[in-house]
């Protein structure tokens, strides 16, 4: 399968997987126009849409795409049932698309019903996990989001993390504010800065590498623990995650 990213709005990415026959899967189409343009340019035949959550910048293009291609099956969590979803899926279930099984993983936090889709090596994680960061907590709690990204972090090392936004540069600036002397974070920041200066995408990222540079995945790391302990003594990784998320919200 071939992985494609379609830029949308200011910083969204709509992901598309296509097979050799030209059948394709579209993930979180917040805007139909760039997707329709890509379909036309590549002669794709849309088979399915995956929705991760109900926010408009992830579902806004569904109606127009389905009107154009009525054969599309739209998979999504319960919270997207009024956004065009025709097949509601939940944690532990699978979606069989393009000849591959995609596992559905519940990841509450950004929204309460947020889900992700995984078929090795592809992880479509919506607004749960970003390179260098994680999603804002619009509906869920820090505890829920901590457990959600912990689940994703446990996936295989070679997982390709397909996030829905280009937030990497700002996330790495935050990471540097927390761990300014970390070599991995500094190296990755320089790489990301160069890519963004050329207006190039920083995604997808390999999960093994992401674990090294994403402070939200390093809540049991001694360097991070020492930094946090300078301000407040937090014994549990979950508490340290909440501390980081609060810092990031004000960054």
UniProtKB/Swiss-Prot annotation:
- Cofactor(s) of this protein: Zn(2+)
Spell out the Gene3D superfamilies in the cross-references: Ribonuclease Z/Hydroxyacylglutathione hydrolase-like
Give GO terms for biological process.
Answer: methylglyoxal catabolic process to D-lactate via S-lactoyl-glutathione
State where Zn(2+) 2 binds: 57-58, 127, 165
E.C. code: 3.1.2.6
Which catalytic reaction applies to this protein?
an S-(2-hydroxyacyl)glutathione + H2O = a 2-hydroxy carboxylate + glutathione + H(+)
InterPro entries the UniProt entry points to: Clx_II_MBL, Glyoxalase_II_hydrolase, HAGH_C, Hydroxyacylglutathione_Hdrlase, Metallo-B-lactamas, RibonucZ/Hydroxyglut_hydro
Q: What domain of life?
A: Bacteria
**Which class of enzymes does this protein belong to?**
hydrolase
Keyword Metal-binding in the entry? The reply is yes
Q: In which pathway does it act?
A: Secondary metabolite metabolism; methylglyoxal degradation; (R)-lactate from methylglyoxal: step 2/2
Residues given in the record as Zn(2+) 1 binding sites: 53, 55, 110, 127
Residues making up the signal peptide according to the UniProt record: none
Outline the subunit composition.
Answer: Monomer.
- Assigned protein family: Belongs to the metallo-beta-lactamase superfamily. Glyoxalase II family.
Function of the molecule: Thiolesterase that catalyzes the hydrolysis of S-D-lactoyl-glutathione to form glutathione and D-lactic acid.
Q: What is this protein called?
A: Hydroxyacylglutathione hydrolase
Organism, scientific name: Escherichia coli (strain UTI89 / UPEC)
